Amino acid sequence: MNSLPPRPSLDVLPEALRPDLIRLLDDFESACARDGIALDHWPEALVRVWAGSGFAARIAIRRPNLLLELIQDGTLARPLEAGEMAARVSAVVQAAQDEAALMRDLRLLRQREMMRIAWRDLSGEAGLDETLGDLTDLAEHCIDQAAAWVHGQLVQRHGEPRDAEGRPQRLVVLGMGKLGGRELNFSSDVDLIFTYAARGETDGEKPLDNQQFFIRLGQRLIRLLDENTAEGFVFRVDMRLRPFGDAGPLVMDFDTLEGYYESHGREWERYALIKARVVAGDREAGRELMRALRPFVFRRYLDYGAFAALRDMKAMINREAARRSRGDDVKLGEGGIREVEFIGQAFQLIRAGRDPRLQLRGIRPVLRRLAEMELMPGYVVDQLITAYEFLRRTENHLQMAQDQQTHRLPESDEARLRLAFSMGHDDWEGFSRELARHRRRVQEHFQQVFAAPQGEAEEAAGAEGPGQAVLASIWAGDRSGERAQAVLAEAGFRDAPKALEWIEDLREGAACRSLTATGRERLDQLMPLLLGAAAGAEDPDTVLSRLVTLVRSIARRSVYLSLLVESPMALSQLVKLCDASPWIAQLLTRHPLLLDELLDPRSLYAPMDREGLSAELDEELSQVPEDDMEQMMDRLRQFQQVQMLKVAAADIMGVLPLMKVSDHLTWIAEVVLERVLSLVMAQLHARYGRPRCLIDGRPYEPGFAIIGYGKLGGLELGYGSDLDIVFLHDSAGEQQMTDGDKALDNSEFFARLGQRIVHVLGTYTGAGRLYEVDTRLRPSGASGLLVSSLKAFELYQETKAWTWEHQALVRARPVAGDAHIAEGFAEIRRRVLGICRDREKLRQEVREMREKMWSEHASRDPSRFNLKRDPGGIADIEFMVQYWVLAYACDHPPLLDYPDNIRILERLVVTGVLPEEDARFLTDTYREFRNRIHRLTLQESDAVVDAAEFAEQRETVRALWRRVMEEGKA
């Protein structure tokens, strides 16, 4: 009998666990004697490990040599190096002479590795990440290399499977759940889906069609891994997540698989695919498949229906847990692992289609990303991750005890003590208190995220009053017309018959009649809430009419109904904004994607500055493939709409003053123009190369710039403003050609660039239009070239431009593009506007232009006043300012410092051209008029008011006009 060193001390163990460990040590010593094994020392952690894992002890007793090997190779004391697990599995597979040998040796390898993993975990050497990673690696390499081995066996008999073009085909294995997320637990089964790229047949003497080939491969692979032999199993294989579950074929080709998810895919399958990952076989083909499935998993819109679907799934789990008395289930019970996963994955299902930063597999990276994106508070994420790690360690230790796939807390005192001891506690009570604390926090956060919809929550709490019930019955049509009208009148609707008519038209209309059962259910949940919210508005009737229009437009897209049902905040903000502005109501109706912005008032009423806008748009566009111009155009439109909504919301609530409103709207346009120019330029560079030329014999790369005129140039954009822009380039000299394979003359290149920019800005897509673009202020107007060279622009302004074109130049500035051209344009502008002019002739030309505008556009109704065009309005002020600049800039160059009217008026005072009193009056009046126009735009009204409203200001403006423009007095 081989001698063994003295037994290790059992002092670290609770008294109740020592007898069992003594028996295990007795059995191990007998096994060593039986197999002629000698240990020169007992591993220090053996007592702690065997106290927590009878499974690890039994393997060592059955095969002492496995423990000896692990001691000798040092892997009980160190983590595996990169590639080491793969090499261990490969050595077993390569040495296998036949299937029986492979089955045996894989199982022995599994015993050895599971003993090592349990040892390092229970001894405290390995953290959770290492344990989960090693378990995942073991499973993944066993699946991958076993699949390759079976493939080779089948090829010998039937030949290589090929598609119609003769390309070889391999099985693709998708790992689902915790395997896909690299979070496999100790005794987990592996959830797999088998697929392959294309139909065809094998090229051998006994050919099979590819479907049969891969079915046989899958069946043999499952047997290799799953069958329970004298040595146990490698991994239990669960194929129930495949399309149609147990009733479906074991293997599907890509087209059939994609077709299934497009036609039959359910919410829980989207949830399952979040973590899906190619774990074996043809990984490149598998990655292509995952890209194809991404739109099913991650919807491009914000999918708030995911809340309801996950809530239903969790309710089903809770019912099943209750039926099986699983209150002590750390995975499925309340406050358990599944609730943590649901929290993170709900945000993924809802948002990851729009924001690929959330397209992650592991739950902890997802939670951390949510904190980074400020979608969840940092302290909540910290609590969830801490709880998750504690629960996962508990789950692993439960399973390490006997290598059983259990998630339930033990019932016997001894088993409870073992678990508590393995988790670092001296007794069950201490462990139980810590567990309860973590589960309570998880449950609280879960309930906050998955709170029942507003109506359901009231009902569940017994708080639903008769008002809510009555409104629900009105929507359902359960009350007669008179009774329904009486209720609506009592609720606050002034024209109850009309309100009822709107409700009935919506209920009986085509949009609602064609709803799916899910859509109808969500609409039925929303409408009583919406009626109650509208009744509480300042103008219930107007709000209801606007909300009904919006609901009709979104009814077939139940995700938006879900958003309003799920979020009291979103519904509250919707009512507030629809009450305040039909323009905002129409914006939301046309672009319901914007409803997501209503969830967070902190963001909704806080428009970004220019730097923030630029960073935000860069982030948005970085998530789109560079060659997907269609999606780029949609993202640009969505960005612009979101930012304009924020400005309008802040404006309507009085958060932003007038000048800031125009600043923000102008910044949005500038940022959009910069990105559109950059995107289109890159597209044309890829196709034609970069423009080149020789100037004075030196190589030069010409640039391109966008010049903003009018309200864009003057930083005075309104909500409905179009963009007056002019395109310039600075190509000159010789050899003006692009350097690509499809070379173009530079003038043609820049013309195409300008055309493409106009197209991107002005084309309607499914996401709407960016801006209406007007390029008629370019040299020679609509008959001139779309894009001019800087030299040609300079020559035109100096020799051919009309006075009205110089007036327009007053409010012009570079807004995007090449800095060198911007400097050149600024110099041309200063020189042209600074020319000394005949003031009498200038005054006559400006006056004639103003009279022409008035005759063509002014109001003919003396009881009405067009704020923009009528005498005494904005146009008079702008024309006077332009006259003063053109008349006096020769003597006072500071008048050319700015392109906007307000700062020019300030300069007119500083230079002594205009009395301060007149400048102050014009400034205040100009702001009042513009502010009123903003208000009218948000009410979807023309810029026309009652003539009496601004009578005094209007008359004073006309008096100034007569004094300056007719009498020639300053």
Swiss-Prot record:
EC numbers, comma separated: 2.7.7.89, 2.7.7.42
Chemical reaction(s) catalysed: [glutamine synthetase]-O(4)-(5'-adenylyl)-L-tyrosine + phosphate = [glutamine synthetase]-L-tyrosine + ADP; [glutamine synthetase]-L-tyrosine + ATP = [glutamine synthetase]-O(4)-(5'-adenylyl)-L-tyrosine + diphosphate
InterPro entries, per database record: GlnE, GlnE_rpt_dom, NT_sf, PII_UdlTrfase/GS_AdlTrfase
GO cellular component: cytosol
SUPFAM superfamilies xrefs: Nucleotidyltransferase, Nucleotidyltransferase substrate binding subunit/domain
Biological process, per Gene Ontology: regulation of glutamine family amino acid metabolic process
Keyword Translocase attached: no
Protein role: Involved in the regulation of glutamine synthetase GlnA, a key enzyme in the process to assimilate ammonia. When cellular nitrogen levels are high, the C-terminal adenylyl transferase (AT) inactivates GlnA by covalent transfer of an adenylyl group from ATP to specific tyrosine residue of GlnA, thus reducing its activity. Conversely, when nitrogen levels are low, the N-terminal adenylyl removase (AR) activates GlnA by removing the adenylyl group by phosphorolysis, increasing its activity.
Family assignment from sequence similarity: Belongs to the GlnE family.
UniProt keywords, alphabetically: ATP-binding, Magnesium, Multifunctional enzyme, Nucleotide-binding, Nucleotidyltransferase, Transferase
Protein name (database record): Bifunctional glutamine synthetase adenylyltransferase/adenylyl-removing enzyme
A molecular function GO annotation: ATP binding
Natural source organism: Thioalkalivibrio sulfidiphilus (strain HL-EbGR7)
Cofactor: Mg(2+)
Nucleotide-binding as UniProt keyword: yes
Gene this protein is translated from: glnE
Residue ranges of coiled coil: none
Positions of the UniProt region annotated as Adenylyl removase: 1-454
EC class: transferase
Pfam families attached to this UniProt entry: GlnD_UR_UTase (PF08335), GlnE (PF03710)
Region described as Adenylyl transferase: spans on this chain: 468-970
